[in-house]
């Protein structure tokens, strides 16, 4: 943490500082694999720093690494076509994250956590609300729709921005 702060402090003197976006994250949460708590196993930090472009704050929204490309492209206001199924993490969006874990696909949202084998539900953990069959069913529909859409786009080579 200290080294990152020192680097940013020194880089403020660079002429390109105002037009630079710093993105710091991890590619996995290795230390958390010992936990049985899914929210802890998959939680990784994401730090986006660009005083000219990003308002300071902390987001409690769910997101995953598939959202990084869309976030960066939108933040940099890049022109042209690109392929992504992610959402911009800096905008209001459906509050969920989909994470693959080997052959399993997981979805996190305020409604809860659901792990699916694409044949059946492997694990369901309700969110902050009282557990409901409707919430579980909604999460299952979301994760299956996400997987189906990804499959269709890949097999037909028809990626599009959603």
Q: Which sequence ranges carry the predicted segments?
A:
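Solvent-exposed soluble domains appended to multi-pass membrane proteins
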Residues: 1-162
